[in-house]
Amino acid sequence: MKTFAPLLATLLLAGFGSALQWWEHGNFYQVYPRSFKDSDGNGIGDLDGVTEKLQYLKDVGMDGIWLSPIFASPMADFGYDISDFYNIQGEYGDLAAFERLSAKCKELGLRLILDFVPNHTSNQHEYFKKSVQKEDPYTNYYVWHPGVTNEDGTKSPPSNWISVFRGSAWEWNEDRQEYYLHQFLKEQPDLNYRDPALVEEMKNVLKFWLNKGVSGFRIDAVPYLFESVEVENRYVDEPLSRATDDAENPAYLIHNQTMDQPETYDMIYQWRAVLDEFTAKDNQTRIMMTEGYTSIPNVMKFFGEGEQNGAQIPFNFQMISNLRKTSTAADFARYANLWLDNLPAGRRSNWVLGNHDNNRIGSRLGEAKIDLYNIALQTLPDIAVTYYGEEIGMVDQPIPFNETVDPAGLRAGPDDYTLYSRDPARTPMQWNSDKNAGFSSADKTWLPVATNYKQLNVKAQDAAQKSHLKLFKRLTTYRKRQILTHGDLDLRTTDSNLVLYKRKVDKVGYVVVVLNFSDEPQSLAAIKQQFPGADDRLQVVASSKLVTIKDNKWINVADTELPGESAIVLQKLWGPNPVVVYEA
């Protein structure tokens, strides 16, 4: 059993509308621009395409959109190798296209969040080119080392560190006659945050885009920002993990010298201070989201420490990292509770079930459970983050090696690429049953469109009597009401593989959500067994595809079964359950 009282849960009807800032119960949508909508027919999504579809995002209930990287890039890692932080990638448009997008967001009341990639740049960036030549102030913008001289006079890297993308994390540069560090591709040299000039320049990047009206940033690859310092003219080797015999695989080492260094958190706090400067000017809160696949204690440090504030939304990857198709109700509860048990007082929860680096929900957790997980995402406390296409139940599209473009897959080779390639979860958005699913008029798109697009698309689901999309819209509308914005949480499991949780606000009412992780029907009598004070009759708010009971109908819970791998949202109101209006 888990009980959890979110911040401000006791605020009731009088004045509760002023209790929440816009992000505190926000619904955020990750747009992968390359795959969202192509406006000019070249097979690649772009900013004008995103602008064209903003009304759709408003209609599905979003409060903010997070754009994966849109800055100038040679595209060695599809935008995560930035060659100019102050300009837009030409394939996506230009600054004028960005201004159009920003203006339309403001018109629709959508907040715009940009992906900030601070750990590294492209090796084509002017910073790097000038650092190679030792032109100040760029000389120490990157992590350089002359290497270790061997007895025969040859050079070796200054440590055994391994890149995320396999092989040594050190690359020799002939012009500078030194090694540079790259924790990702060799085309992505690591920036040196021990250099004060670099720290100030990256703050200038944030300020540039804040001055253009963005509402915040998602910070990429945060645990990698700092490495340990040199000891006796070399870096400390990382210990062997014993997890694999493959010495090229990053899992070969325990990354205690290249991740989660103490200085990382102070850098996050410094960036938050930049955002707060802008918030103070106009009382419009700017937010920070952080990406960190690291331990729970480390993630929680991103929130802040003492008087220092950090990210409002350190991404909660517990379910992405740990749940699979075979996961049970107990597994779901374990990872929900692990997050909630460690959440610092006064901080907001967030729930992330998909992104561009992981298999889609249907492929990772089971197609039959797509609705179940979307119901959970939209009814758990506080913030929800949705990856594009998950609202219609898009699934991974198998892609042959000769059409693979993801460097992680290509570097693994034709035998193992399917274990590493992220391309299957990045295919074009499926808008309708027209050519290329309505994504593009091009003869060839940058990645193949999923073969199921004729049946699975936005237009078809909008027209269907019951669909993933219609359920998603109903959920995002309902979650703006007071029970889900302010209700406490009481989460339980049963031996029959059910998760049940209750969200309640005194004098307003309560919601009960039931998730059936079994593949067999289960009686909703479990509601009364787990919550003895619950009513015999409850009203259906929403349900997954296999549930035949119509929304708004009243049911006797003791007489009702929930189909396998399905979910249902029920309510009992004692008074008005109004929509909560957010502050700036």
UniProtKB/Swiss-Prot annotation:
Disulfide-bond pairs as recorded: none
Hydrolase listed as a keyword: yes
Q: Which UniProt keywords apply?
A: Glycoprotein, Glycosidase, Hydrolase, Secreted, Signal
Q: Thermal profile, per the record?
A: Optimum temperature is 35.0 degrees Celsius. Active from 30 to 60 degrees Celsius.
Q: In which tissues is it expressed?
A: Saliva (at protein level). Proximal lateral lobes of the salivary gland (at protein level).
Q: Which InterPro entries match?
A: Glyco_hydro_13_cat_dom, Glycoside_hydrolase_SF, O16G_dom_2
The protein's location, in the record's own words, is: Secreted
Signal peptide: which range, if any?
1-19
The similarity annotation says:
Belongs to the glycosyl hydrolase 13 family.
List the protein's name.
Salivary alpha-glucosidase
From which source organism is this entry? Culex quinquefasciatus
Q: What high-level taxonomic lineage is stated for the organism?
A: Eukaryota, Metazoa, Ecdysozoa, Arthropoda, Hexapoda
Gene (UniProt): MAL1
